[in-house]
Amino acid sequence: MSLPNAFVTLLTTSSYLPGALVLLHALHDLHPAPRDFQIVALVTPETVDAATIGELRRAGYDLVIGVEPIGSGKAGQVGLELMGRPDLNFALTKLHLFRLAPFFSTLIYLDADILPLRPISHLFTSTAPHVFSACPDTGWPDCFNSGFMVIRPRESDWDGLKGMLKDGEGEDGLYREAGNGSFDGADQGLLNEWFSEDGGGGDWNRLSFTYNVTPSAAYTWAPAYKRFGHKISNVHFIGPNKPWTSLPGRPAGVSNVKGKENSYDYLSLIDRWFAVYDKHVRPASALDPDISRRFAVPQTIAAWDSHANQARAAATVLPEDKLDLSELKAATERGVNAFKPGQYTSLPLEGRVDLIMPKPKAIPRAPISQLVASSTIAPSVSPSALTPPPADAAPAPAPAPVPTQTEQKTAQPSVWDAQRSSPPASAPPEMSVPHAYYHNAWEAPLSQQSSYYAHPESHRPATEHKEPEYPTLPKEVTGDSWYARFATSTPDKRAISAVFPWEEKSYGPGYGHGSRPKPERVFPKGEEPLPSLVQQLIHPLQPPSISIQNPTPPHPAHSQHQSHATGMGMAGQAPKSPSPPPRHVSMVEAMASYKNVWDDIPQIGRYVDIMSGKTGGKSVRGVSTRGHGHGHGHIQGHGQGQKQPQAQTHERNTSLHSLQSVPGTPRTQYSTFGKSPRLTNARNLERRESFEQPEDSADGDDENSTSASEEEGGKSREGNSSKPYKGNKKYKDRWAQTDRVKTVDETVQTQTHAGEEAAAGGLKMWGLPHASAHGRKSSKEIPFPIGSGNGRAGGGGQREAQTQHQSTYYEYQQQHPHSQQSRQGSMASPKPELNVRLPDYSFDFKGATSHAQGLAQAQAQAHGQPQGQGANPNLNAQHRHRPSGSFSTIYGGRGRVWDPNTDVEVRRRDSQEVLARFMQGSLGRG
């Protein structure tokens, strides 16, 4: 019984599925039933998914055969890259066609990218008796193109092709020129080598080019295509661009050919391929969509209403792949060549049952421990002989005598591969991985943290840590003179050159030439106990000692009394009581025991307090009872360290003497330039009286601010208010200070009576003489009450000041009615409101010299004015405070009168004198 014929195609990737389906339906259209041939597809399950194989079976392929992929390998990559088609790396799988000799007599092979245009089944008989027939290639016509072939398979051809693949590798393991036996790296070069005049398969039979037309943009002969185009039987779409690559962007039934047909009709051939695809492969809904069905409302049928569906589901339906009993009997009668339509079978190589390519066999590698052992043991000794047998094992038989002539086998050196296995347990120390877990020390309680810092010899077991055994250098290295300086265990100190000049000198007892002193500084080792400060944090803290220090050395009797009162001090400490049991303390308690080293030196503490302007946390002007000279004057302990009244008075007087020596800038209340001493002394007396009133500013840093302890000793101060602390040589007049803030109102000026004073807590605004030659307004002293930071000047004091201001202001208006007129015209000025924010007053020190130059002229004009012009004889022009800014135009454009006592140089000189007195006072007390 003769074997059937078959059309065969190959599918090594799922991307060629549209081409294989179009090829199947084109053959069906060109060869209607009944057909005397089969259509077979070779697939590689390793590279093609199961869904693609299922589509081929459902589409109508008579048989789907699974085969193993044959790759070009690294040797064939050179030819594929030269051809520019690296995607053809599995093209050698086409050689499985010659293994189909037991199943088919004649094969017509077509690539999946070929479109048949005319019937070609007559080639099954017309090509006889040739074994191999093909069409010439357009690139090299002396060679055939393997995309279309007529083959009568033979087992000898399969064996010869396998031999050529193996012969491509030389004896030295390197591939010759072409690589794997194919000059292009793929199947076409290998087949042209075998089916040639010099090949083992004989010369190939040439078919007409019309059976394998390869249109491309690189090569075409338009006149020949126009003359013989109607005779084309197959169109082969070679190249990387296939017709189905434009499937996502090409709708069904659309043609790319527009207008007149081109001489190169490549687009019309593409349209013919899509015509077959749209007819058989593309879904029917895309060709003729049913709008009513697409937008119909779905209906749900109840399960109890579908009796027919239940009956159909109950019926036993055999799978398509499973044959019933009758088909199995028929298959046994017809033989193994009878297959059911759409059947799938496999054709593994070399008798294997798995089509997956086998992995390369790994060379057995000996463990590293055996390699290390083999380096010191003779090769003839077996490793198993070195392993002692178990105690209960039977005695081994005596080994056979070793022949005199033994074969010495060289073991393959093995190297550990980190990508495949973990490090061996018996590896050298440089390859061993430590398996240890370390806990965070800061997460443990304080009682356990001390164990981490203990000496290792007392707490660490001796067997816990073992130094690894490092390999030694081979004898060949140590005995070689070339490695002599590197193979010695101890380095030669003579080879070390000195870096610094003093390193050339050796240690000696003296400092003479050629010797240098031996260093006395010793650095602690790494495992030494921690410093005492760190141990205080680790171990339970003991209660801190109570100590009080005075800023100045007190009287001997007072020192003894204080030492007796405190019980414990820096000079003499009482015997300590037994410490309480250890307890866990917090970080705040641990940090409370710290103190600065310089806190024990009272001279440094007093100097810091004086330079910072504070004593015990208060202002320099205030008096504090805190006697600790370095700022830590709070008494620790329970009721200890309380001073006696006599000691407090003595310390307070000492602090007052040291604080009252702090003067300010020497400045009087009024300018004394050109004034009589009588008027100056009178105003100085008024200034003294105003300073006796306690007034504090809002920032608490006023020169008159006092503390609560100063008010307790107020009686002694009131008795000697006119001459305070005359016994102190460093004391300077307290009221010779910078004036308080004064302001001048725009319309209301201060009065001309020098003897009147403003109410307590108010600001005095000084103006200019009334009815001067330049039309200035009369001056009137207006009390302006303000509130202090501590509220002393507020409340009733402010209301009293406001009442006095109103009465004084109205009397002044009745006596001087003409002062209501404005400088610009007859517009009446409104009554000033005291709650209006006054502008800032500034003083230009750079312009003080120019103002001082016109001082003499200002005095002459003020004294030379007649009495009938309304000049004020009690106040001169140089004594008036002139505001800056927009107020300079109100007072005739004159600048502020310069006072010699407010000069910058005078203030700088006085500040230097004050600093010198402070330094002398602090050093004298220290």
From Swiss-Prot:
Biased composition (Pro residues): 386-402
Keywords associated with the record: Cytoplasm, Glycogen biosynthesis, Glycoprotein, Manganese, Metal-binding, Transferase, Vacuole
Stretches for region Disordered: 379-432, 452-476, 547-584, 611-749, 768-903
Subcellular location, record wording: Cytoplasm; Vacuole
Reaction(s) the record says it catalyses: L-tyrosyl-[glycogenin] + UDP-alpha-D-glucose = alpha-D-glucosyl-L-tyrosyl-[glycogenin] + UDP + H(+); [1,4-alpha-D-glucosyl](n)-L-tyrosyl-[glycogenin] + UDP-alpha-D-glucose = [1,4-alpha-D-glucosyl](n+1)-L-tyrosyl-[glycogenin] + UDP + H(+)
Cofactors (names): Mn(2+)
Positions glycosylated per UniProt: Y219
Residues that coordinate or bind UDP: L10, T12, Y16, R85, D111, A112, D113, H236, G239, K242
Principal EC category: transferase
Source superkingdom: Eukaryota
Chain positions recorded as Mn(2+) binding sites: D111, D113, H236
Protein name per its UniProtKB record: Glycogenin
Organism (species): Cryptococcus neoformans var. grubii serotype A (strain H99 / ATCC 208821 / CBS 10515 / FGSC 9487)
Record lineage: Eukaryota, Fungi, Dikarya, Basidiomycota, Agaricomycotina
Gene that encodes the chain: GLG1
